[in-house]
Amino acid sequence: MADEKPKEGVKTENNDHINLKVAGQDGSVAQFKIRRHTPLSKLMKAYCERQGLSIRQIRFRVDGQPINETHTPAQLELEDEDTIDVLQQQTGGVY
């Protein structure tokens, strides 16, 4: 009889962390490891620090949909190796 339980220390498919890619408009890609239930604000702030950007200057999107700081990867149904796009906020209009 085979024992179906995973051995201690061996990673399983249902681990608590996922790896996410954050793609900038300039083609750069940064990778982050984050817990599935951690608010994305942690990832957003870390990305801004790495890139020297203000969080007020950029917007984060998944599959074209805006995300905010309170969302978690689990809420957005993000999977391992999914990509979050970063766009610079554009201000414009008629003078």
From Swiss-Prot:
There is a cross-link at residue 93 (Glycyl lysine isopeptide (Gly-Lys) (interchain with K-? in acceptor proteins)). This is Small ubiquitin-related modifier 4. Keywords: Isopeptide bond, Ubl conjugation pathway. Interacts with SAE2. Covalently attached to a number of proteins. One of its GO terms (molecular function) is ubiquitin-like protein ligase binding. PROSITE patterns: UBIQUITIN_2. The gene is SUMO4. It comes from Sus scrofa (Pig). It holds the Pfam family Rad60-SLD. Residues 17-95 form the Ubiquitin-like domain. SUPFAM superfamilies: Ubiquitin-like. Residues 94-95 form a propeptide. GO terms for cellular component: nucleus. One of its GO terms (biological process) is protein sumoylation. Belongs to the ubiquitin family. SUMO subfamily. It comes from the Eukaryota.
